[in-house]
Amino acid sequence: MEVIRYPDSPFKLHQPFPPAGDQPTAIAGLLEGLSDGLAYQTLLGVTGSGKTYTMANVIAQSGRPAIIMAHNKTLAAQLYAEMREFFPENAVEYFVSYYDYYQPEAYVPSRDLFIEKDSAINEHIEQMRLSATKNLMTRDDVIIVATVSAIYGIGDPTEYQQMVLSVKEGDTIEQRDIIATLVSMQYERGDLDFKRGSFRVRGDVIDVYPAESSENALRISLFDDEIDRLDMFDPLSGSLHQRVGRYTVFPSSHYVTPRDTVLRACDSIKEELRERIDFFTKENRPVEQQRIEQRTRFDLEMLYEMGFCKGIENYSRHFSGKKEGEPPPTLMDYLPSNAIMFIDESHVTVTQIGGMYKGDASRKQNLVDYGFRLPSARDNRPLKFHEFEKVMPQTVFVSATPAKYEEEHAGQVVEQVVRPTGLVDPQIIIRPVATQVDDLMSEINDRIQKGERVLVTTLTKRMAEQLTDYYSELGIKVRYLHSDIDTVERVEIIRDLRLGLFDVLVGINLLREGLDIPEVSLVAILDADKEGFLRSHRSLIQTIGRAARNVNGVAILYADKITDSMKAAIDETERRREKQIKFNEEHGIVPQQIKKQVKDIIDGVYHEEDSGKGRRQGKNKVKVGEIHNEEDAIKEIAKLEKAMQQAARDLQFEEAAVLRDRIRNIKENLLFGAE
């Protein structure tokens, strides 16, 4: 592993191997585009060509902070894990929605039903979000991996920065002033329960557990009114890590605001409330008038007394001082002016960003019309697409199949078609629909004998279920992946396929972007000639690409006629194959099969040889006790089940799956007397 630092760059790139294939020309092309000031570029990178590694090299060589946007949490977590491997010494941050569960408040007029907001916040992800904004304000070497959560409103960065507590050894400050500042930053005093976002006081010592920190707490030791020393310590064991000369404590929430801003906002809210009461009075709607008055006055009372209230985000326009209709502050406002943005799988992500505002607006309008919220609540919203375009820094769209928007906005298109491994795009075979099920059966048996895996994509849920049942009855180990399966189970299923617990995975629209399964040598597309979203040329190219990570990769399209979409997908795949084969011949490259360990999404690596033993490699080790009898086994299972549920809550899905296997192994081998 080589560690590279480029001139004038704060990043240290841990390079497992030098760029190869099309990577060097892609990196050089993107860097040239950035220095030429191109607003938009497209990296057209085929599956398995190492697009993430190219991004890492561009970031390291440009020396500029970066944000990488993905269209779902699973893909974001995968990118985050890879970026942390490339930049372990830099600030790689994860910014996604911190809700494990979220039910927004809504009103259904037809049933006169008001649904209260209900949510469960994931502590670990909240800490990572706060860490992201802190590092954007204090460091140059920052890489943020985010989902569309980045375009939703958070606190104003200017006021957030005003609310910090900066302490330095030798400063003169009274203990009560430090405590008052911490309370105004929404830190809780917890002398008994010392947790993230709290502080405790013991004589002349104040311990602060910063909201954005997961491993370190700050000890402020005072001598009379002077700061005698500052130490970082382990909040769990209490052992000192290091002495620091100065430290900045950031607020425990993005919505913390100075007292004078709260008072100014309250006056503005009162003014809007008066206008709304007058409106409902004129309209002769006493129920709505009483409702808006009661709800808003309660919130105002909380704001006066506590500085915050439930649903404070609905008053964000009053706090930020923005005019009606102006965009709310978002993570984009925290980005430095020289940042770079990468939009991964842009053909999906760009469309997703564009659709966020409308769904939110229709729900809010009902709440405003029926007196549950003031009209200003409509401005607590995600960015509209044209607003997002205005705040986009220099952007690189990353996709194997760029859509219309990227084609219209590409200052230049940089191709990354040749893979570092020498692997070429899969060979495409077309066969008739009439015999597709039985023909596929014989193909599956061939692959099973070679120890390879198969992906099958169907058009309907019903067909996927019937196909799964049929193959299962014939003794094939097959699973079915559908939209009702949650993220945890989806990751488990893909991991189990890679480990060989089953051989065939059947799906509808879930076998496309971001699935990295080198063991898959055959992708079968049933009813490929049925035009539509699932069989568009982009969908076909993405699905065919799932077999591109295997040296024996083949895609079989079952069709009775060649549609325009099929022709476009086949032509593009053939164009890429020709270029890849020619490059290999010119450079004497023999395609190499990818051998990739099954990784944990957030931390560590799961080794195939540990399957069934459930050992963890990495930070989050679960210590396995010595098991001598049935009582020990039952205790161990209870402990592991608790750890498994916690891992799932923290979105560490693959860790949860490892623990599940460990539980299963104990049950089979110890409780039920298996050999």
Swiss-Prot record:
Residue intervals of the UVR domain: 634-669
Residue numbers binding ATP: G45, V46, T47, G48, S49, G50, K51, T52
GO MF term set: ATP binding; ATP hydrolysis activity; DNA binding; excinuclease ABC activity
Motif annotated as Beta-hairpin, chain positions: 98-121
Any one of the GO CC terms: excinuclease repair complex
UniProt key word Protein transport: no
Pfam families: Helicase_C, ResIII, UVR, UvrB, UvrB_inter
Compartmental location: Cytoplasm
Record's keyword annotation contains Hydrolase: no
Residue ranges of domain Helicase ATP-binding in the record: 32-417
GO biological process: nucleotide-excision repair; SOS response
Keywords, alphabetical: ATP-binding, Cytoplasm, DNA damage, DNA excision, DNA repair, Excision nuclease, Nucleotide-binding, SOS response
Location, primary (coarse class): cytoplasm
PROSITE patterns reported for this sequence: HELICASE_ATP_BIND_1, HELICASE_CTER, UVR
Helicase C-terminal domain mapped to chain residues: 436-602
Gene3D superfamilies named among the record's database cross-references: 6.10.140.240, P-loop containing nucleotide triphosphate hydrolases (3.40.50.300), UVR domain (4.10.860.10)
Described function: The UvrABC repair system catalyzes the recognition and processing of DNA lesions. A damage recognition complex composed of 2 UvrA and 2 UvrB subunits scans DNA for abnormalities. Upon binding of the UvrA(2)B(2) complex to a putative damaged site, the DNA wraps around one UvrB monomer. DNA wrap is dependent on ATP binding by UvrB and probably causes local melting of the DNA helix, facilitating insertion of UvrB beta-hairpin between the DNA strands. Then UvrB probes one DNA strand for the presence of a lesion.
PANTHER family per record: UVRABC SYSTEM PROTEIN B
Family from the record: Belongs to the UvrB family.
Subunit structure: Forms a heterotetramer with UvrA during the search for lesions. Interacts with UvrC in an incision complex.
Domain notes: The beta-hairpin motif is involved in DNA binding.
Protein name: UvrABC system protein B
Source species taxonomy: Bacteria, Pseudomonadati, Pseudomonadota, Betaproteobacteria, Neisseriales
